[in-house]
C-alpha cells in the first residue's frame, strides 16, 4: 500500500509589536514548520527617539534627565555612564564619598533591574505569583530613591560630573540597612519557591543554549556571558568607581541555557546586597562633589575667594567644556556592558555620542538560538535575554 506523504508549507507568523510593559515594542517575524521555528527575524526601531543626536546638542547637565529613558528599568546606570564619559575625558577626580554613594545607587538599581526581569520572566513561563512579590521589594528601592533624589523609577537626575547632585538625607543610611536586612531572606524565599520547582526546571532547562565560544563571538555581555562559562564582570575588570574596596564574588554558570541565566541573576542580587552593606558601613565623610566642575569663570580672572558667581546652584557649570579627544567608557549594568564612545571638540556639547547598549548587542543572538526550538519556547528564551526596547532602539 502506497504511503501518503504530508508536506506542509512553512507558515510566517507575526509576534508583536508587544505592549511596552511586556518585552517592549519588539516584533518577531517567525517562520514555522508546524511547531518548530525555522527562522526568526526581529524587527526593531519602534521606540527610536534619536537619543544620540539629542546628546550632541545638549550640555551634560541638560542631558542627564534624558538618559533614564534609554533603559527605563536602569536609570541610574544610564546617568552614571553619562557623567563618567566627560569625567574620564576631562580627567576630573570624584571624591571618595561620592564614589561610595554612586556604588550604593548602582547596586540598588542592579537589584531593581533583576527583580523587574524576574517577575515578567516567571509570568512568561506560566508562574504568575512571583510577579506580585517582586513589586513589593522594588517599591522599597523606589522609596529609597525618592528619599534621596526626589524621583522614583526614572528621571532621578542624581549623578553629576565630579560627584552627585545632593548628599544623602538624614536617616537614609539606616533605611537602606533596613532594606538589606529585609531583602536577603526574600531572595531565599524566591529560591525556595522557584529554583527547585520541577515544573519550572522542566520548562526552561536545556533551552536557548549558548556555548562559551558563541557568547564571546556574538559580543554578549553581563549575565548572558557569565551564564555561558565566561567569568567576566567589568566591576572586577575595569576597577571603576570604588568596587575594589569591597569583598564580593563574580557568579557564573557553564550550562548556557535559560536556567543558568536565571541562576546568575538571582545570585547577583545577593552580591549586590553584600556590596551595599559594605558601602553603607564604610561610607566616608568629605564632599559629595568636585567643586572644580561647578566653577563658572575660567582662566586668569577666576579667583576662588571672590564671590563673582563662580558657582551656580547645584549644577555643573554651563561653561564646562568637553576637551578635544575621544574616549570609550563602559560599566557593568544589570544587563551587561553599557558603554559610551564620546568625541569632544573643546565645546560644551559633545561632537559625537555613541551609545553601546548591552541588550541591543545581546538581542543579536536571538535568531541564532531560536532556530529549531518549539514555538512555545520563544517567549521563555526572549525573556531570559532581558531586553528593554528603549535601550535597544534608543
Curated annotation (Swiss-Prot):
GO MF annotations in UniProt: NAD binding; oxidoreductase activity, acting on NAD(P)H, quinone or similar compound as acceptor; quinone binding
Entries under InterPro entries matching the protein: NADH_Q_OxRdtase_suD, NADH_UbQ_OxRdtase_49kDa_CS, NDH1_su_D/H, NiFe-Hase_large
Keywords: Membrane, NAD, NADP, Plastoquinone, Quinone, Thylakoid, Translocase, Transport
Disulphide bond pairs: none
GO biological process: photosynthesis, light reaction
GO CC annotations, alphabetized: plasma membrane-derived thylakoid membrane
Cell location: Cellular thylakoid membrane
Membrane-spanning residues: none
PROSITE patterns (alphabetical): COMPLEX1_49K
Entry EC number(s): 7.1.1.-
Known catalytic reactions: a plastoquinone + NADH + (n+1) H(+)(in) = a plastoquinol + NAD(+) + n H(+)(out); a plastoquinone + NADPH + (n+1) H(+)(in) = a plastoquinol + NADP(+) + n H(+)(out)
A Pfam family hit: Complex1_49kDa
Enzyme class: translocase
Domain of life: Bacteria
Quaternary organization: NDH-1 can be composed of about 15 different subunits; different subcomplexes with different compositions have been identified which probably have different functions.
Listed name of the protein: NAD(P)H-quinone oxidoreductase subunit H
Organism: Microcystis aeruginosa (strain NIES-843 / IAM M-2473)
Amino acid at each position: 500500500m502506497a504511503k501518503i506523504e504530508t508536506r506542509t508549507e512553512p507558515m510566517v507568523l507575526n509576534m508583536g509589536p508587544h505592549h511596552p510593559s511586556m518585552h517592549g515594542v519588539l516584533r518577531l517575524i517567525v517562520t514555522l514548520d508546524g511547531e518548530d521555528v525555522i527562522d526568526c527575524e526581529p524587527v526593531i526601531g519602534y521606540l527610536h527617539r534619536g537619543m544620540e543626536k539629542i546628546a550632541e546638542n545638549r550640555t551634560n547637565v541638560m542631558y542627564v534627565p534624558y538618559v533614564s529613558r534609554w533603559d527605563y528599568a536602569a536609570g541610574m546606570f544610564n546617568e552614571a555612564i553619562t557623567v563618567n564619559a566627560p569625567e574620564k575625558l576631562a580627567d576630573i577626580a570624584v571624591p571618595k564619598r561620592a564614589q561610595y554613594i554612586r556604588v550604593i545607587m548602582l547596586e540598588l538599581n542592579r537589584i531593581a533591574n533583576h527583580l523587574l526581569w524576574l517577575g515578567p520572566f516567571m509570568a512568561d513561563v506560566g508562574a504568575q505569583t512571583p510577579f506580585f512579590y517582586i513589586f513589593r521589594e522594588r517599591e522599597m528601592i523606589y522609596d529609597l530613591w525618592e528619599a534621596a533624589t526626589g524621583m522614583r523609577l526614572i528621571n532621578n537626575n542624581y549623578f553629576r560630573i565630579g560627584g552627585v547632585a545632593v548628599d544623602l538625607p538624614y536617616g537614609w543610611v539606616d533605611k537602606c540597612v533596613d532594606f538589606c536586612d529585609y531583602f536577603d531572606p526574600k531572595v531565599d524565599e524566591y529560591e525556595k519557591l522557584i529554583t527547585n520547582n520541577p515544573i519550572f526546571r522542566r520548562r526552561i532547562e536545556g533551552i536557548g543554549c549558548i556555548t562559551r565560544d558563541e557568547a564571546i563571538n556574538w559580543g554578549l555581555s553581563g549575565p548572558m556571558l557569565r551564564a555561558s562559562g565566561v567569568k567576566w564582570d567589568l566591576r572586577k575588570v575595569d576597577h571603576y568607581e570604588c568596587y575594589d574596596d569591597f569583598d564580593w564574588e563574580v557568579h557564573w554558570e557553564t550550562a548556557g541555557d535559560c536556567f543558568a541565566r536565571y541562576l546568575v541573576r538571582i545570585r547577583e542580587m545577593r552580591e549586590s546586597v553584600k556590596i551595599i552593606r559594605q558601602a553603607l558601613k564604610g561610607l566616608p565623610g568629605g564632599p559629595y562633589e568636585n567643586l572644580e566642575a561647578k566653577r563658572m569663570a575660567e582662566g586668569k580672572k577666576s579667583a576662588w575667594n571672590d564671590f563673582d558667581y563662580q558657582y551656580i546652584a547645584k549644577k555643573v557649570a554651563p561653561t564646562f567644556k568637553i576637551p578635544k579627544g575621544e574616549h570609550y567608557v563602559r560599566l557593568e549594568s544589570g544587563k551587561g556592558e553599557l558603554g559610551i564612545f564620546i568625541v569632544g571638540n573643546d565645546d560644551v556639547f559633545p561632537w559625537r555620542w555613541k551609545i553601546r547598549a548591552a541588550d541591543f548587542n545581546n538581542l543579536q543572538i536571538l535568531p541564532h538560538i531560536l532556530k529549531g526550538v518549539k514555538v512555545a519556547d520563544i517567549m521563555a528564551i526572549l525573556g531570559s535575554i532581558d531586553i528593554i526596547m528603549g535601550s535597544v532602539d534608543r
